A protein has these predicted regions:
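Short loop/turn motifs at secondary-structure junctions
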Residues: 15, 43-44, 72, 152-154
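Conserved beta-strand segments of alpha/beta enzyme cores
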Residues: 16-18, 109, 154-156
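Acceptor/aglycone-binding surface of glycosyltransferases and processive sugar-polymer synthases
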Residues: 22-24, 28-41, 46, 58-138, ...
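Acidic donor-binding segment of Leloir-type glycosyltransferases
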Residues: 1-20
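Short beta-strand segments at enzyme active-site cores
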Residues: 45-50, 158
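Acidic donor-binding/catalytic loop of UDP-sugar-dependent glycosyltransferases
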Residues: 1-4, 51-67
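Hydrophobic helical membrane-anchoring modules
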Residues: 131-213
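Anion (oxyanion) recognition and catalysis
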Residues: 11, 69, 149
Length: 213
């Protein structure tokens, strides 16, 4: 099974690492949340999320970690630099998702809503999860950033080279996950409406020269 293979890899390359197991597949968001909660329970203040499909340049991990040390209160997000293998459908879907995130936050703070390489300040992000951001599927990545902007948690971006191998494996289920993401955008657009006075006031303050501390 995949768990047995993971245990062997950890024993070989990272002895002492904690592997969080579940009886059933909870989805990407469920796996990330479980990892964040386990890291906090173990006494860590921050955790790094990285997709398991090999699309992100592992050299970027050092930059993500370094920026998290410099800006410990911020979510450090990968900003993809794509190679020529990205399909037009995938590219425009990412752009549409990010564009909708701008509408949901009344800002352009979110540069890329889908990149799965990030460093999270655990207390702040787990508070968002408990406050309604507990999304268990592929909708976790964009929704947690939208909720972070709503909560005025700053974001910081690091360029990450992203490559999609021609014979690579994707865990994205087009029908199911597109349904979850479409429903997520509907919820967030309606969730933005009662928050819009605060979001607009914050935007005006920054336009008048009162930057984020």
């Amino acid at each position: 099974s995949s768990v047995v293979r993971l245990e062997k890899l950890l024993d070989e390359h990272a002895p002492g690492a904690l592997l969080v197991k579940h009886e059933q597949n909870l989805g990407k968001g469920g796996a990330v949340i479980s990892g964040l909660e386990a890291a906090r329970a173990a006494g860590y203040s921050h955790a790094i999320q990285v997709d398991a499909d090999g699309q992100h340049d592992p050299k970027a991990l050092e930059s993500i970690h370094g920026q998290s040390c410099i800006y410990p209160d911020r979510i450090i997000c990968g900003q993809p630099v794509f190679d020529e293998n990205i399909s037009r459908v995938r590219y425009y879907f990412r752009f549409l998702t990010t564009y909708l995130a701008w509408a949901e936050t009344l800002s352009t703070e979110i540069k890329d809503a889908l990149c799965g390489l990030r460093a999270y300040p655990l207390d702040a992000v787990l508070k968002l999860v408990r406050g309604g951001g507990r999304r268990l599927r592929m909708d976790f990545d964009p929704e947690i950033l939208v909720r972070a902007v709503w909560a005025d948690i700053p974001l910081h971006y690091v360029s990450v080279h992203v490559s999609y191998p021609v014979d690579g494996t994707s865990h994205f289920q087009y029908i199911r996950d597109n349904f979850y993401i479409s429903w997520m955008h509907t919820r967030l657009l309606f969730g933005m409406l009662p928050r819009s006075p605060v979001l607009l006031a914050r935007k005006v303050k920054r336009m008048l020269g009162r930057p984020r501390p």
